[in-house]
Amino acid sequence: TIRGQKLLAKADVIIYAGSLVNPALLEVKKPECAVYNSAHMTLEEVLGVMKKAEQSGKTTVRLHTGDPSLYGAIREQMDALKKMNIAYDICPGVSAFCGTASALELEYTLPGVSQTVIISRTAGRTPVPERESIPQLARHQATMVLFLSTGHLPKLQKELIEGGYTAATPAAICYKAT
């Protein structure tokens, strides 16, 4: 977003989620900006960089992709920053599901087809409550947007069909659609 670009341009410190963030986003940074790839950092290390920057009066940007309210894993960071009395602001980007719809030129809600969008994910390292399992959600026959699920495609297909979708149901698998 334009707001995100402005924040990156004035940051003294940027901590970005390495494999998830397009490196082109970092091109607007100041030459003297310290940049950290968090892909190989623990939460404690990330927080340590933030705390040190705050103590030095520096502006830090913790760069995630998309909308951090969807599988953004920011709760722990927010809680820790509050405990350290470090003020923060959240600047959401465009969620992958919105960018994907635009890139594919499709609409998730169509009259007579679906007026509901279910956003979820398959169970992986993080479990999903049984009431939110793919077969349970598929029973609604609504449009489904599934994050973090490409590593489970055979199981996912089986569960979607078990829930009521047919093998002819349109589907798209998208990676870095925007």
Sequence positions of predicted segments:
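Class I S-adenosyl-L-methionine
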Residues: 2-94, 99
